[in-house]
C-alpha cells in the first residue's frame, strides 16, 4: 500500500526488521552471563545462543486489577469472542477471522471484539491513504467471509477497560503465530475467563491443556473454530 511504501514498512520489510532484531538479540545474549525468563521456549532459545548463560526463572506479576473479581457466565455477553490485539501478523488475528465461518454456522450470533487501534478503516480519504498491507488483508478477509458488523475494534484500553472486556466476553482467544508468555492470556486466566490459545512458543508452559485453556495448533483455523465451539 502507499502507507507501506512511504514508511518502508511492507510485510517483507517487517520480516526483515524482525530478522535484524534477532541478530541483535543473539549478540546481546552472547555477551551476557545471566538471563531471566519463565518458559522452556525462552530458556532453550537463550541457551542456544549462549550455552554458558546462567538462566534464572522469573515469573511475571500481572497488573493489580486482574487479581480481583472473576468471570461469570450469566453476566458475560453470550457468543462474544475477545482478542487483545490484532494489528500485526504475528498476533494471528487473521486466523480468528478465517475461523469465523465455521463458528457462525453453529452460532450465528457470534461476534468478535478486539482491543487496539483499527487498521482496517477505509471510509475516509485519510484512512485509505493510511491503511497498511496487513490492514487491507484483514479487510479483504472480512469481506470474503461476510463479517461486516461482526467485528468491533475497541481502541486502546486501560487496564480497567481491558478487565471489563475480558469479563464481558464468552471466550478469550490468543491466536498468535508466536508468543513467549503473553500477559493477555495470564490476565484472562486470572479472571477465570474461558481461554483458547495457539500451541506455540512458551504458551503451553502457561496453561494446562483442557483445564485452564484449550490449545490448537498455530494456524489451524479448523482446530481454532472447534476449540471456540466447545
Where do the protein language model's features map onto the residues?
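Conserved donor-binding/catalytic core segment of Leloir-type glycosyltransferases
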Residues: 72-91, 97-100, 112-113
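Short hydrophobic beta-strand element within catalytic cores of glycosyltransferases
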Residues: 194-197
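Conserved acidic donor-binding segment of nucleotide-sugar-dependent glycosyltransferases
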Residues: 209-210, 214-221, 230
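Membrane-proximal helix-turn-helix segments that form the acceptor-binding/catalytic region
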Residues: 2-34, 48
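Aromatic "clamp/platform" in nucleotide-sugar-dependent glycosyltransferases that forms part
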Residues: 177
